């Protein structure tokens, strides 16, 4: 197995082009100026590591035909580096085991707080929404 490093995305937090400023000073004619949020895939001695899980992660992995990773390293707790974390559940289904997650203490605390439902032993706190169920003020029901 070969070692490899793939830059999955290198765009700023809003992506390029952004909704607000478009391409900014970047040339829209250059395809390299269409960039997804920052993420990197590292494969070394058979270990597959994802660095950050931005909101574009699923599309990035599909584009590179990456279907599995062994772990994730988080650089920091900004949304553009971790809000694709929910898509790791599909990788859990493939592996049938938990993923190793690495981060500094502050970042790990933020992840555990924002995404508590991803932790082992999580108990669902709300009954599933079904057509016809009433919700009180302040509660939300989504039907997909």
Residue ranges and their predicted role:
Residues 1-144:
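Binuclear metal-dependent hydrolase catalytic cores
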């Amino acid at each position: 197995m070969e070692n490899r490093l793939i830059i999955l995305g290198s765009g700023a937090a809003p992506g390029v082009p952004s909704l607000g400023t478009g391409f900014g000073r970047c040339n829209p004619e250059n395809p390299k100026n269409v960039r997804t949020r920052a993420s990197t895939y590292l494969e070394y001695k058979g270990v597959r590591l994802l660095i950050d899980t931005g909101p574009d992660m699923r599309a990035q992995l599909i584009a590179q035909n990456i279907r599995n990773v062994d772990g994730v390293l988080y650089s920091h707790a900004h949304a553009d580096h971790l809000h694709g974390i929910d898509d790791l559940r599909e990788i859990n289904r493939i592996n049938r085991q938990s993923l190793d997650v690495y981060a500094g203490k502050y970042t790990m605390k933020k992840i555990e707080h924002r995404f508590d439902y991803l932790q082992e032993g999580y108990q669902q706190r709300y009954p599933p929404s079904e057509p016809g169920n009433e919700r009180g003020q302040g509660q939300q029901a989504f039907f997909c």
